[in-house]
């Protein structure tokens, strides 16, 4: 199994995702996703954990369930990611980081040039303690990227809606 990852790539690619001049309505949770959460004893407002497996090119969304533990909600195939297996260690290394990252509503961008996007908060506490550097590492839509993790618009819209309600 590949190392666990959270967002990655080139800072130039991710930070160029400025706000569009036209505001758009952010994606909302579908009734289907609400039913999936309910079936797994999860509430929409429960905390979220996102992890990405580089080798498998998969993004997982985990939420706290009624037991108070994180449980897997859904796995999504990724369109693109850059770098190689192994951790990100410094700003500008074009390497995707590997670790666990807590996503909060303040890290969401509903006006991304790539549909919607969110920052996964690299570096996490362990990476900071190790002296790893980097910022503005995103997951976004449009299934095209020169650095960040890219998903289809429908995938990132659903993930965005899950995170926004947390």
Where are the regions a protein language model picked out?
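Bacterial Sec signal peptide processing site at the extreme N-terminus
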Residues: 10-36
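Well-ordered beta-strand positions
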Residues: 51-53, 140
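Exported/periplasmic cell-wall-interacting domains
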Residues: 92-166
């Amino acid at each position: 199994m590949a190392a666990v990852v959270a967002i990655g790539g080139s800072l130039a690619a991710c930070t160029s995702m400025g706000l569009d001049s036209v505001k758009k309505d952010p994606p909302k949770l579908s009734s289907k996703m609400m039913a999936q959460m309910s079936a797994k004893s999860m509430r929409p407002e429960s905390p979220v954990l996102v992890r990405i497996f580089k080798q498998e090119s998969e993004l997982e969304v985990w939420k706290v369930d009624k037991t108070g533990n994180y449980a897997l909600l859904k796995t999504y195939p990724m369109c693109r990611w850059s770098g190689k297996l192994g951790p990100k260690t410094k700003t500008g290394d074009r390497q995707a980081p590997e670790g666990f990252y807590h996503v909060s509503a303040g890290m969401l961008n509903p006006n991304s040039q790539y549909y919607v996007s969110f920052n996964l908060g690299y570096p996490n506490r362990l990476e900071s303690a190790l002296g790893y550097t980097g910022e503005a590492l995103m997951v976004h839509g449009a299934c095209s990227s020169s650095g960040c993790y890219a998903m289809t618009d429908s995938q990132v819209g659903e993930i965005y809606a899950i995170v926004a309600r947390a």
